[in-house]
Amino acid sequence: MRNILLIDGNNLMFRAYYALPPLRSLSGKLCNAVYGFCNMLISAIEQHKPDYILVAFDKGKKTFRHKLFADYKAQRHPTPEDLIAQFPIVKEMLDTMGVKYYDDDRYEADDILGCLSSQNSQDNVIIMSGDRDLLQLVDKSVSLQMN
C-alpha cells in the first residue's frame, strides 16, 4: 500500500500568507506565503513519508459551479495581489523539488483532490487542507490533515 500525500495548494498558500508577518526576500519581494508553504510541505513530507505527492491549485477562474449558481463564492474577498504574485514562485519551487502540481481551468483544487483520492482508494491517502468541505472524502483509506 502506497502513501499518497495530496495537498490543497491554495489553502496552504492562504494560510501561510495570513499566518506570517510580511517577510521579504533580499530583492524586496514579499515571500511570507512561499516561506510558510515550504515549511508546511517539508513538515508533511517528514511526518508522512509519502511515496507520491501532488499539490492541487485553483486557477481562480469561474468553474461549472458558477454556471449552476450565479452567486457561487460571491461573498469572497478578492485574493491580495501580493499573494497572487507568490503562486508562480511556489510552483517553481515545487518543480525544483520534483513535486508535481496540477491546476485546471474547469475545476477547483478540492475537485482535483476528491478525484485523486477516489482513484487511489486502494492506497493510504492523506489530504492536507484546512477546508472542512473535504471531510466528506474521509473513509478507511483517506484521512484529512487539517492545517
Question: What residue ranges belong to the model's regions?
Answer:
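Noncatalytic, basic helical substrate-engagement surface that gates or grips nucleic-acid strands
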Residues: 2-128, 132-147
